[in-house]
Design a protein with these regions (language model features):
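C-terminal, beta-strand-rich globular interaction domains
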Residues: 183, 190-197
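Amphipathic/hydrophobic helical signal segments and adjacent flexible N-terminal regions
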Residues: 3-105, 198-200
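Short beta-strand segments that buttress and anchor functional surface loops
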Residues: 97-99, 118-121, 160-165, 182-185
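Acidic, glycine-rich flexible loop segments
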Residues: 146-177
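Short, exposed beta-strand-loop hairpins at the edges of beta-sheets
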Residues: 172, 180-187
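Solvent-exposed loop/turn segments connecting transmembrane beta-strands
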Residues: 103-106, 164-168, 188
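Aromatic-rich beta-strand edge motifs centered on tyrosine
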Residues: 111-112, 172-177, 194-197
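N-terminal glycine/threonine-rich, aromatic-flanked beta-hairpin/loop signature
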Residues: 103-147
Length: 200
C-alpha cells in the first residue's frame, strides 16, 4: 500500500514538473533589445567595469531573458553600465571563463554588480539575484526549450549554489585562486581560466 502511494506521489510530481516545463507561459520579456544589436565577441572581457557606484545600479537595468529557446548571436554584456559594488558575501567571479579540465572547452561569461549575476553560456542567459529565492532566481529555458526555475545563493564558503526549484543543489561555482571551478550535478568538476575574448 505504501509503495502504491509512493508511486502515485512520484507520478503526480512528475506530471506537475512536466506541465511547468512545457505548458506554463514564460515571464514577460524585459530584455533590453539593444544587447543584440552588436556582437558580444567584440568586447575585451579582461577590462571589467569599475564597481565604484558612479553609474547605474542593478535595479535600474532590466532583467534579461533568453530569446526563444536560445540566442544565435552572443549578446553584449547586460550589466555593462552597472557600477553598484558587490553586495556583502558575494564573491567576484566576473569574466569570460574557458574550461581547461573536466568539461574542456566549457565557455561562460559571468557579469556581476550588487547582488545580481548574469551567466551567459550555451545559448542561454541566466539573469538572477543571489538572494536564495525563486522569485529573484533564474527563470530560464533548458536544453530542450523547457521552463525551469532556480534559487541561487552564496554559501558560507563563497560557493555560488544553484538549487533547482529550491529543492536540490544542481550547479556550483567557486573561485580557487585565479581559476573559477564549475561543478555540475553529475559531480564533474571543470577548472576554468579567464580569457579576454571569445575563441574563433
Amino acid at each position: 500500500m505504501i509503495a502504491k502511494w509512493s508511486l502515485g506521489l512520484i507520478a503526480v510530481l512528475v506530471g506537475v514538473l512536466l506541465v511547468y516545463a512545457f505548458a506554463v507561459p514564460r515571464p514577460f520579456d524585459t530584455t533590453d533589445p539593444t544587447i543584440f544589436l552588436q556582437d558580444g565577441r567584440s568586447v575585451n572581457y579582461c577590462e571589467l567595469p569599475e564597481l565604484d557606484g558612479s553609474g547605474r545600479t542593478a535595479e535600474e537595468i532590466p532583467k534579461a531573458y533568453t530569446p526563444g529557446c536560445s540566442y544565435t548571436k552572443i549578446p553584449m554584456p547586460i550589466l555593462a553600465d552597472c557600477t553598484e559594488p558587490l553586495a556583502e558575501g558575494v564573491v567576484d567571479m566576473r569574466g569570460l571563463w574557458l574550461g581547461v579540465s573536466g568539461r574542456v572547452g566549457h565557455l561562460e561569461r559571468i557579469e556581476q554588480c550588487g547582488n545580481r549575476v548574469v551567466v551567459t553560456a550555451y545559448g542561454i542567459i541566466h539573469d538572477f539575484r543571489v538572494d536564495g529565492t525563486l522569485e529573484n532566481g533564474a527563470r530560464d529555458v533548458g536544453a530542450i526549450c523547457n521552463n525551469f526555475s532556480t534559487a541561487i545563493h552564496f554559501d558560507d564558503e563563497g560557493v555560488m549554489v544553484f538549487r533547482l526549484f529550491d529543492l536540490f543543489d544542481t550547479v556550483f561555482r567557486e573561485m580557487r585562486g585565479t581559476e573559477m571551478i564549475f561543478t555540475f550535478i553529475d559531480g564533474i568538476e571543470t577548472r576554468t581560466q579567464r580569457i579576454c575574448s571569445y575563441p574563433e
